[in-house]
Regions:
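Conserved beta-strand position repeated across blades of beta-propeller domains
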Residues: 24-27, 76, 129, 207
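Blade-edge beta-strand/turn elements of extracellular beta-propeller
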Residues: 2-19, 45-66, 98-127, 181-199
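Beta-propeller domain segments
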Residues: 72, 90-92, 101, 105-112, ...
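Hydrophobic or amphipathic alpha-helical targeting/insertion segments
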Residues: 23-46
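A short loop-to-beta-strand structural motif that recurs across blades of beta-propeller domains
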Residues: 1, 32, 40-42, 102-104, ...
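Short coil/turn segments that connect the beta-strands within blades of beta-propeller domains
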Residues: 30-31, 80-81, 134-135, 211
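Residue position within the beta-strands of beta-propeller blades
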Residues: 1, 35-36, 84-87, 139-141
Length: 213
């Protein structure tokens, strides 16, 4: 939406692209627009200068899973300059392949599209941000269904080292074994939440306040 006259409402709507599957992730860096669909991430170079000329996207990667259950990809650049990409579990509760239930990061200029695991055991995060002081990654995670109305809690988690495992599908809310996958698992082997949130709250966003209040 464009507002060249600085009026109260946008005066023009420009279609940048179409036919994408669930393009839910958007971020902007150095003049380029990045869009994440279910299985791919696209870059629209110098988007402000090419809006009116049907910009042709560059495919950053098309190697993301095609599963649509928890398949939306919310993306953001970290303070390290890498693009962070969550890949949710393709189910309510299951023991998925390694690429799922994780947060990854990647160099958008890497021709091999290499994904690095940042966090594992993450069922479905759709909200994450970086501490403006330390640069640490924080994220919310939505807990599984079908364990009752009052459990498990949704979670607020803090990544303190690359590759940490936050429990899914074995341990929920830091201390509760899963009835299907938790047998023989110890809660102490996984990183507990920094804060438990209300069960089934669906915490779908978070951001650090950067004002002066």
């Amino acid at each position: 939406m464009l507002n060249p006259n600085n009026s109260a409402t946008a005066s023009e709507v420009v279609e940048i692209d179409k036919g994408l599957k669930s393009p839910s992730g958007l971020t902007y860096r150095n003049g380029d627009l990045y869009v994440a669909a279910i299985s791919k991430i696209l870059r629209y170079k110098d988007i402000a200068a090419t809006l009116n000329s049907s910009p042709e996207p560059e495919t950053i990667t098309d190697k993301l899973p095609t599963k649509s259950h928890h398949g939306w990809k919310f993306i953001e650049f970290g303070p390290d300059g890498l693009l962070y990409v969550p890949v949710g579990a393709p189910c309510n509760i299951c023991e998925p392949e390694e690429v799922f239930a994780s947060i990854h990061r990647m160099d958008v200029n890497d021709p091999d599209n290499t994904l690095e695991h940042v966090a594992r055991g993450v069922r479905n995060t759709v909200g994450f941000d970086f501490d403006p002081v330390t640069g640490d990654l924080w994220f919310t995670d939505n807990g599984r269904d079908a364990m009752g109305d009052n459990m498990p809690a949704d979670e607020l988690n803090h990544v303190t080292r690359i590759g940490e495992h936050f429990g899914y599908p074995y341990i929920h809310q830091g201390d509760t074994p899963d009835p299907e996958f938790g047998e023989g698992k110890n809660a102490s082997d996984y990183t507990p939440p920094t804060q438990n949130l209300a069960p089934h709250a669906g915490a779908i966003g978070m951001a650090f306040y950067k004002g002066n209040m």
